Amino acid sequence: MTEEENLDMLLSLFAESEGQDLESPAAEEGEDNLDDLFDEDDDGEQYIEPEEAEEEKEEEEEEVSPGKSSSSDLNKSKEDLEAELKLMQEKMQKLQQQLEASQKTTPAQNKPAVQRQSTKSLTSPQAGVKTTPPTVRDSDGSPSNITAKLKNKQRTAHQPKAASSERQIPIGQSTNQPQPMRDGAKVNSMLKSPPLIKTPPTVRQPTPRLPVNQEVAVEKFSGLRLRKPRLSSIDIEQKMASRKLIRLSQLPDRLARDNLEDSDWVTFAVIINKITPQSKNNGKTFSIWKLNDLHNLEVNVSLFLFGSVHTDLWKTDTGTVIGILNPNPMKNKEGSNELSLTVDHPQKVLIIGEAMDFGTCKAKKKNGDSCTQLVNLYECQFCQYHVKAQYKKMSSKRAELQSSFTGSAPGKGRGRGSLKERLCQSDFHYGGMSSLACAPSMSAPQPKKQPTIQSALASIPTKKLVLNSGQVSGCSDDFRGLMSMPTPGALNIKRHLGQSKSSAVAGSSVQSVSASDLLKQQKEQHQQRMMARKKRAEEIQKRVLQSGGAPVASSRPNVSRGPLLSPKAASEGPKGSGSSLSGPAVPTLGRGFSEGEDIVFDMSPPSSKSLSATKLAAVRKLQAKGSVIVKEDPNAVKRKRANSGDITGRVERNIVKAKVTDENSASEEEEPAMKKRREQLEYIQSEEFQRILNAKSSNSWMMGEIEERAMQEYFEPLVQKEKMEEKMKSIREMKCRAVTCKTCKYTHFKPADRCVEEKHDYHWHDAVKRFFKCPCGQRKICLARMPHGACSHCGLFKWERDGMLKEKKGPKIGGELLMPRGEEQPKFLNSLK
């Protein structure tokens, strides 16, 4: 059954090859030989991956022989084909015999892997396309030659070019070395037509992608960075060898100035917009492309596609870089100055690749929508209308990028508000009138502030007021429960009530005394205190002498024994007055002392007669023994005589120490410093030390990536800021809206209030604003070709064109600051004439 299927498959393949051979001469006769077009050999119509380019070259070399033999195959007769079929049948029988023999010897575990690999190789995308068998004109019918042919035929996984239909694509492939086939089922799978489902090939390894930060080369002729290039730089140079390049932004001027009909010229552009295909009166469809070269974003060109050009190219995506060969200019519409071009053949348009720098502005409009202005992402990410605002926004973030700015407002770290907040706390008086410090705020109303403690306490009626008013009705249970809890509010109320009670009592004991009476009272109190102090000291001395072993109270009182009493209480202590002072509970000098205790402030040194208990006990013991202590003379010179034994021991120790030092010095002389240094160098140069020195962590690459990422995050904003500066420096003029008042005869960016109020004859129109600068540094923006007046700073009329951003000048060197003639005075010396 398998042999019949194989024969049917071979017959169908031969029939298809005959049909293709019959169609190929007609196709070759119908081809046009266009010498002045880009793609004579149909290059560049299909995108080819870099890996597939080499494989395609090998495939083309292998397909040369089948292409040459196509003319000879047409002359074959049916008898020759039948003979070839018989030959193929014999070969298939031999192959089947070899498969049966190899199936017995092959281990079972190798079958799934080989079968999986062969099935994957047959499910490539090219399998779904029309296939043709290899030519079978070899005299050698060995299986090795057939497997070699099958192996050499399968090389690529991409789809064949649509235009080159005469190319033949093999049906089978094998990634291993030529060897006998192992399974009959595998032969059937190779001879059967594969399914049409496109699956990616698994034999080829994935293409290594470029890193993100790797620079992409700029194409020579278009000046743009390309993504997925269709042609190599060498092919583009060959096509541009005898042709002249004209920039798209310069094309309107060149067409108006020069005659380009006789020359062979090319322009490159990017498709920035595609208008929906439209129909003409005769029913034919055409399309319009908007083109720009991304170097001058103000110059756009329209390309009209008619007939076959529209049929072949209308699916081209936006952002594609194309080259146009000798386009024909068209007449402009009435009131339109935009240049329009057209081409008469599809091969006059060369698709190069995709523009990597094609994009739109990333800023937002005032209404919140995204900006749709065209930008070159390599130069700047913002259009000329938003770049200045973004530059100011990025410049305001300098503190966040290059300092330790925390984001908190200054002056609020210690509870201080801003100057406005501090001024707005109260009114101010000026000129005899009172006014608010600040105007009322237009912001949302602030929440109501909580009442302060003073206001809450003032609202609580005191006990005295309630008693006087006769409104005491008792305390409620809820209030009593709240007051019993140790909350801050309850404690504050209790403290307030206690202070009011004490202040009332203290106020009733105040008496008026004259100055002389007050001095007399103070003098009497002082004398009483001194007398009480002396009596107290005498009593203490008597107690000490009577109780010999008992501890003696010091003449200076111990402050830590209790709270102190007032001087008045101390003076009344010896008199035996037991009544306590009645007065306000205010801090006193003797706080903490009990009633009747004394405080002695006698700072005089103690008398020599008074001895401590320990000294008295020692004196009594000496008297009992009968010994007497002789008093030493303090003026006598004391000298302690050393013991002879100590001296001899010290001498022996010094001798032993000297011997040890001599031995050490001798050993040091034997090993000089050079020898030690040599040993150290030998250790440093040893393998062990070098291995320790060169040892690194296995995760050191992670630190490198982190540092690189940190550097990129730091420098990326600076690079973007520099790009914005360069873009603003390059902008010399901008389109804008202006107003012209015919009554007042002026043109400005907005109308004056007087013109609006009096309803003058003014109208809005499109204008161009230009930037100028004076040698003195003054800048001016003007809507005319040149400013009408002189410089307001220096009085000169020497205006020069300048960019949107003022040029930043660095520090000047000494030669620039040197003025040999001194400071110039043009108004007096006329030095500028």
Swiss-Prot record:
Region of interest called OB-fold domain, as start-end residue ranges on this chain: 202-360
Zinc finger-like 2: annotated segments: 741-760
Region (Zinc finger-like 1): 361-386
Residue span of region N-terminal domain: 1-122
Residue segments, region Disordered: 18-208, 502-589
Record's compositionally biased regions (Acidic residues): 18-64
A Pfam family: zf-primase
Keyword Cell membrane: no
Biased composition (Basic and acidic residues): 75-93
SMART domains: Mcm10
Polar residues bias (residue ranges): 115-126, 165-179
Keywords from the UniProt entry: Coiled coil, DNA damage, DNA replication, DNA-binding, Metal-binding, Nucleus, Zinc, Zinc-finger
UniProt free text on domains: Each zinc finger-like domain binds a zinc ion and is involved in both ssDNA and dsDNA binding, as is the OB-fold domain.
Similarity section: Belongs to the MCM10 family.
Subunit structure: Self-associates.
Name recorded for this polypeptide: Protein MCM10 homolog
Organism: Danio rerio (Zebrafish)
